Amino acid sequence: MERIKELRDLMSQSRTREILTKTTVDHMAIIKKYTSGRQEKNPALRMKWMMAMKYPITADKRIMEMIPKRNEQGQTLWSNTNDAGSDRVMVSPLAVTWWNRNGPTTSTVHYPKVYKTYFEKVERLKHGTFGPVHFRNQVKIRRRVDINPGHADLSAKEAQDVIMEVVFPNEVGARILTSESQLTITKEKKEELQDCKIAPLMVAYMLERELVRKTRFLPVAGGTSSVYIEVLHLTQGTCWEQMYTPGGEVRNDDVDQSLIIAARNIVRRATVSADPLASLLEMCHSTQIGGIRMVDILRQNPTEEQAVDICKAAMGLRISSSFSFGGFTFKRTSGSSVEREEEVLTGNLQTLKIRVHEGYEEFTMVGRRATAILRKATRRLIQLIVSGRDEQSIAEAIIVAMVFSQEDCMIKAVRGDLNFVNRANQRLNPMHQLLRHFQKDAKVLFQNWGIEPIDNVMGMIGILPDMTPSTEMSLRGIRVSKMGVDEYSSTERVVVSIDRFLRVRDQRGNVLLSPEEVSETQGTEKLTITYSSSMMWEINGPESVLVNTYQWIIRNWETVKIQWSQDPTMLYNKMEFEPFQSLIPKAARGQYSGFVRTLFQQMRDVLGTFDTVQIIKLLPFAAAPPEQSRMQFSSLTVNVRGSGMRILVRGNSPVFNYNKATKRLTVLGKDAGALTEDPDEGTAGVESAVLRGFLILGKEDKRYGPALSINELSNLAKGEKANVLIGQGDVVLVMKRKRDSSILTDSQTATKRIRMAIN
């Protein structure tokens, strides 16, 4: 009170007022504080002070022609004084109001295109559904998440080239647009942004948002796809969560999801083939996801998932240095170990050869539903701190950690024999044998582990062998925590090697990934996955195998028919016929194959008995190793639609139906394509097969009389020449060979020579 009174007295004296308003502020420290550097020291004050002035805003001089001096109310809009230090004029805030109401309008057509990501976000939020708020402890763990929905997956460099090309096409500088996505996006954006008046820099920023994946390392409990991350601040706090369903999906999330499904399917299929690595590469290169080549997506997409990483490793791309075991991602945070082979006895006295890691190590374990910190020594678990969504998830993490520790009591807890096999019927390695065993039933493991009394530590509780929580006792070395363990944040990628059985190792030889680690979870892909490889035909069931096999023969008929006559064994061994074998009853495979191969040989030997449709129909049956038997068949059985269906050796059936009039083939009622040539037995389509034993001399020569039909050829004597009508009404001159030994080469040269003779 005293101070205020004193100030009042001072202010009543005119001298005080004069000192405060008229004298300069000349204390150097104060001047320095407020004038050094470009950074505004007190923005709020500055703003208030500026706006209190009559003309706080500067504008380009041209504004004087475009805006009246006074508005309708007679208030002055701009002053004649120039802005100090620039050639701009000072204007009133009222000028802005006038401009907004009466200024020139411009086309808004480009706004939704440039600010596409914002417009789409508004739509998603408009159609999203917010549910109730729940108050509960949130176990958040930091994960690397995509914060920018609706982007393409270009690298920063690729995006930079696209942006320069779209926004500043006339700037100098080498720009190389190589990838398909770069070219497509550039073309599309150039068309969209023709005559765009929005500031180029703004357009460039917005394009960057659309083209590049931006990731942040954020604490998340719940969904990690970008449409959930964009509302993270609305859906989870420290002690609450709000249910939310996004009002739309974005392509980048769909690509990530579909990529994982495609990769899992491919790895699973490759595992059971003769050469897994070669098959995997063949499938990755021939698969498309949402119309984009899978290999292009793999090169650009940073998704880290076991199957995806195996595919990347096979392509020679770098992957994360963490390793996977039991569906958890392990990252060593300290310590080191050396590997040594050791033989151990299970509780069933079965001998296992395990590679023991000797030394003290610490790991973080991160799974979909649980995370943990693990400290271990040689074959001993020292401490495991787990957190998870529920009892089940916590139990999964504990089992994986117990097996990983390689402790003796874990190995002794095995009851019964370990004989788990993978999809290719090969025995799993010992560590995965143990894992599968305890994942099936961990009762004995938990009972034998041992328990210990625990201290009361904030945020930690014990867990008993029956997986119930306790504050007094806990499984030895194991505690449950309320806090999650963060995912490994580094985006560092390392060079890895992969062997033909798809085991991925780092440069020190540690196994990071193997097909055993690939999840068996089946999902439905959001984008269409097109597997062109014959190895994936069976993914849609037996019918698809049947249709695809016949489609393949028809598509490749030109080369197939030449091989059929010249190198049948190579044709029979083609991998495209592999899936078909699973449709033929096991007992019949060898017999069918022997029968069909004999039939084909007769066709090759007897002129004019060639039958295109029959060859196409029976070819897949010749692929199995043949059994020599005298058996004849009038129909062959295939297992589709849950039962055996018959394919007639001569004639049509519901399974294989060739329509002579339309020249189209239908397999199980589905169109399998058209035969481009006339499969009429008389003038057989495969000239090369028919003209064995004849040498093609060239174009028609009238001196040798009228053209004979193929059937009349057999009457020629050795060395005799004749004109022959072949295929599509073309005539060529042939000579019957003097020796039979050279017959094999005929069909090879025949095909080439017919073409030359006709053309």
Swiss-Prot record:
Disulfide bonds: none
Avian adaptation (site feature) positions: E627
Nuclear localization signal, short sequence motif: residues: 736-739
This protein's record includes keyword Transferase: no
InterPro entries for the chain: Flu_PB2_2nd, Flu_PB2_6th, Flu_PB2_C, Flu_PB2_CAP-bd, Flu_PB2_middle, Flu_PB2_N, INV_PB2, PB2_helical
Location of this chain's protein in the cell: Virion; Host nucleus
GO CC annotations, alphabetized: host cell nucleus; virion component
GO MF terms held by the record: RNA binding; RNA-directed RNA polymerase activity
Cross-referenced Gene3D superfamilies: Polymerase Basic Protein 2, C-terminal domain
SUPFAM superfamilies: PB2 C-terminal domain-like
GO biological process, one term: symbiont-mediated suppression of host mRNA transcription via inhibition of RNA polymerase II activity
Keywords for this protein: Cap snatching, Eukaryotic host gene expression shutoff by virus, Eukaryotic host transcription shutoff by virus, Host gene expression shutoff by virus, Host nucleus, Host-virus interaction, Inhibition of host RNA polymerase II by virus, mRNA capping, mRNA processing, Viral transcription, Virion
Chief location: virion
A Pfam cross-reference name: Flu_PB2_1st
Primary role: Plays an essential role in transcription initiation and cap-stealing mechanism, in which cellular capped pre-mRNAs are used to generate primers for viral transcription. Recognizes and binds the 7-methylguanosine-containing cap of the target pre-RNA which is subsequently cleaved after 10-13 nucleotides by the viral protein PA. Plays a role in the initiation of the viral genome replication and modulates the activity of the ribonucleoprotein (RNP) complex.
Family per record: Belongs to the influenza viruses PB2 family.
Record text on subunit structure and interactions: Influenza RNA polymerase is composed of three subunits: PB1, PB2 and PA. Interacts (via N-terminus) with PB1 (via C-terminus). Interacts with nucleoprotein NP (via N-terminus).
The protein's name in its UniProt record: Polymerase basic protein 2
Organism: Influenza A virus (strain A/Seal/Massachusetts/133/1982 H4N5)
